[in-house]
């Protein structure tokens, strides 16, 4: 008694130093279930679990890759598998008196956020004389940390259970992302189709796919019926992140 909700965010994400899948299972699958069971036994009414887009087992593609409300989970990585294992067990714990909310977040960014998603693109922008203009129609989903926090608030306020697929107000291409970073770093670098053509020649490499490939949620799948959780739009979010 005394706690209305537990929000579980602890996890081990992709770490090259970890070669034992058992660690992913212990931290990402067994721990959240144990916490949820303890919460339920103690009379807590609501459990919010931060999961991941990785449960779909779909990576970035240079042809684009859109996940919608009909897409089925099929995790491939130890991270995705362990998170999905937790989801399945948590769903069993859900009752009319114990709400379980699962948030399958895409790349989360913001000032101080670990993972280096924006930092990686910022480093490219700083090193390149211009921004390679290519694959501008290939989009990816991202989620600003303040928007994630607002979604959590709304889910708790409305006592909503189920699965949620959040993202910012729009999906963005790598070029859009680098343009926004360049602008907020005071660089305002121009785009180069010539350099983009050279990048396209290297499309067979994993580096190009990682940088320019897309994986996104459909906007329909990301809608929340009880309010707008996007309290900071993408351009402002990048500005706040790089400030």
PLM regions and their residue ranges:
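Catalytic helix-loop patch of NAD(P)-dependent Rossmann-fold dehydrogenases
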Residues: 26, 61-109, 113
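Glycine-rich Rossmann NAD(P)(H)-binding loop
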Residues: 110, 132-139, 164-172, 182-185, ...
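NAD(P)H-binding glycine-rich loop region in Rossmannoid oxidoreductase-like domains
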Residues: 1-30, 34, 38, 56-58
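Short alpha-helix in the Rossmann-fold core of NAD(P)-dependent oxidoreductases
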Residues: 25-32, 48, 82-83, 141
């Amino acid at each position: 008694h005394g706690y209305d909700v537990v929000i579980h965010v602890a996890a081990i994400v992709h770490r090259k130093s970890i070669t034992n899948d058992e660690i992913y299972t212990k931290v990402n699958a067994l721990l959240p279930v144990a916490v949820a069971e303890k919460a339920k036994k103690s009379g807590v009414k609501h459990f919010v679990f931060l999961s991941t887009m990785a449960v779909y087992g779909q990576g970035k593609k240079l042809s684009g890759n859109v996940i919608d409300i009909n897409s089925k989970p099929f995790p491939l990585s130890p991270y995705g598998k362990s998170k999905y294992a937790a989801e399945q067990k948590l769903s069993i714990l859900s009752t009319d008196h114990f709400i379980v909310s699962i948030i399958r977040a895409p790349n989360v960014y913001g000032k101080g956020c670990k993972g280096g998603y924006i930092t990686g693109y910022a480093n490219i922008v700083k090193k390149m004389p211009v921004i390679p203009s290519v694959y501008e129609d290939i989009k990816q989903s991202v989620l600003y940390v303040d928007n994630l926090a607002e979604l959590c608030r709304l889910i708790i306020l409305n006592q909503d259970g189920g699965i949620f697929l959040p993202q910012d107000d729009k999906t963005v291409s790598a070029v859009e992302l680098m343009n926004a970073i360049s602008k907020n770093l005071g660089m305002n670098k121009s785009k180069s189709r010539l350099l983009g053509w050279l990048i396209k020649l290297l499309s067979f490499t994993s580096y190009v796919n990682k940088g320019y490939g897309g994986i996104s949620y459909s906007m329909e799948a990301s809608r929340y019926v009880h309010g707008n959780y996007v309290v900071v739009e993408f351009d402002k979010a990048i500005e706040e992140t790089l400030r």
